[in-house]
Structure formats: structure tokens, C-alpha cells
Amino acid sequence: MVLATLAIQKGALFIGTNPDKNIPTERGLLPGAGSVVTFVETATQTKPVYIGKPKAIIMERAIAHLGVEKEQVIMVGDNYETDIQSGIQNGIDSLLVTSGFTPKSAVPTLPTPPTYVVDSLDEWTF
């Protein structure tokens, strides 16, 4: 983090992969990339440019790389703020798996619901 802070202060482009504050692990929630980005943002007083979920660039590049249409894709994830928002913001169907970061109890209050919701990937059939 020290090297990143010094580089940004000297004019380096500040790129963040994603704004995930936490990542779920077997041991509980641990700091995610967004926590580190926020630390560096505070230290440098510089806003990052995000290139990962939920930004369009990552979805557009993935779809182009696969050579498919949006209608043939579904965004699967356990984090509403990044995974599912990637689908919603980019016109792609989404499947929220509630066994990870976003709990099932949060689904009724989400501002824009995912296309599909399952408790576990074991329930997903296509």
C-alpha cells in the first residue's frame, strides 16, 4: 500500500479492480479489494478508476471475448453490489446465490431485484 500511495502521489493512474469491501471466507468476512482501494484513496485523496465489476468495461470485454450476445449470458454471483449489479447495469440476466455475501433476507429490500435467486448453486438448472 505504501508503494501504491507514493506512486499515485507522483502521478500514477489509480486503478481499482472492484469496490468489494469484504470477501466471505471459511473464517468469516475478510477485507476485500475495495477496503484496500479505500485506504489508498484516503491516503492519496485521489479517486480510483474502477475497471472490474460492476463497471461495463469488464462485462463488454468478456462478452466480446466469448463471441456471444448479452442475451446468451447470465451473471452469477453472491454479492449484490458487484456481481448482480454487473448484470443489472449492463442489461444481462443475473443469478444471486444467497449462500455467500448477500443473504436471502436482503432480497425483498433490494432496489432492483436479480433475475433469479437461489440458496445454492446446487439448485441452479439451465
Predicted features and spans:
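Asp-based, Mg2+/Mn2+-dependent phosphohydrolase catalytic module
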Residues: 1-126
